[in-house]
Amino acid sequence: MCDIVPQNKAFVPAITAAALCAALLSATAQADLRPEPVPGGVAEIHVAAAGNPRPEVRFDGRPVLLRQRADGWHAVVGLPLDTPVGEQTIQIGPEGNSRAQTFVVGPKAYPEQRLTIKNPKMVTPPADELARIAEERERQLAIRSRFRDVPVNRVDLDLPADGRLSSRFGLRRIFNGEPRAPHTGLDVAVPTGTPIRAPADGVVSLVDDLYFNGKTVFVDHGQGFVSMVCHLDQARVEVGQKVARGERLGDAGSSGRATGPHLHWSVYLNGAAVDPALFIAPPKAR
C-alpha cells in the first residue's frame, strides 16, 4: 500500500541532476535485475537447460516469471516481506507431475520509521470508509496477482521519475505511534506535475482514485510482473492501453495519504511486493 514522504529529509542523500546524468551514461547498458533472495527481495533460479521449452514453475502455488538466458531458463521469484528465512521450494513442471527444487532465503533487517500524520483519518479510517478500503484492497490484490502469459524479454526497469529518493522499500512504519503495514515501495520526492513514466512496456490494468493511494495506475508487464505508481495529481492513461517504456502515465502529486508531492512506486512479482531498487541500475538506486 502506498504511504507518504518521510518528514526526515536527511533519510536518503539527494542525488544531483549532474551526478544522475553521469551515472546513467556509465550504467544504462549494465542495468539488469540484481537478485537478492531475502524477504521482500527476488530469487533467480536456474530451472531448465538451454534448448528446452519454457517450463512451468510455481512458488507458493502461484506461477512465476521465466526469463531465458544463455544457459537456459531462469525462474524470477518474488519473495513477500513475511517469507520465512531458510529453505524454500519451487515446483517445476505441470501440476500433478512436478518436481521440487529448493533455494535459500537469507535474513534482512529493515529499519523502523516513525511518522506524524496530521489527518487522523489517514491513520485510523472512520467506520464508514472501511468497506471502501476493503474493496480497494481486494481489487488491487487481484490486479497484482494476475498472470498474463506473454514473453518478457527484459526484467530491468527505469525509475519512473528522476528526483531525490526519499523513502526506501521495507521500512517498518509507525504512524502517530501506531504500527502500520511496512512500506512496500520506493518514494521519489518530485514537484507536483512532474511526468511519471512507464518503467517498462506493458498494459495498463487499473486506473483509479483510492483511499490511501490516491490517484493510482497499475501497469502489467507480463507473467505476474507488475508496477504501480500512486499519489498522482492526474493519470494520463486508460485501462487496457498499451504503454511503452518511458511513456507518460500521469503527473506527480500528493493525492491520498501523502504530506507532500512525490512518486510512490511499487513492483510486484507473483503477487508479492518486492524492492524496486533491485530492478534499476545501481547508481540510480543508491
Regions found by a protein language model. Give the residues of each.
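N-terminal secretory signal peptides that target proteins for export/translocation
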Residues: M1-A10
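Non-catalytic extracellular/periplasmic "stalk"
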Residues: A31-R164, R168
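A generic structural signal for short, solvent-exposed coil/turn residues
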Residues: A23-L25, P37-P39, A49, E56-R58, ...
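Alpha-helical and His/Cys-centered functional microenvironments
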Residues: F11, A17, S266-Y268
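Bacterial N-terminal signal peptides
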Residues: A14-S26
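Catalytic cores of peptidoglycan-degrading enzymes
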Residues: D158-R286
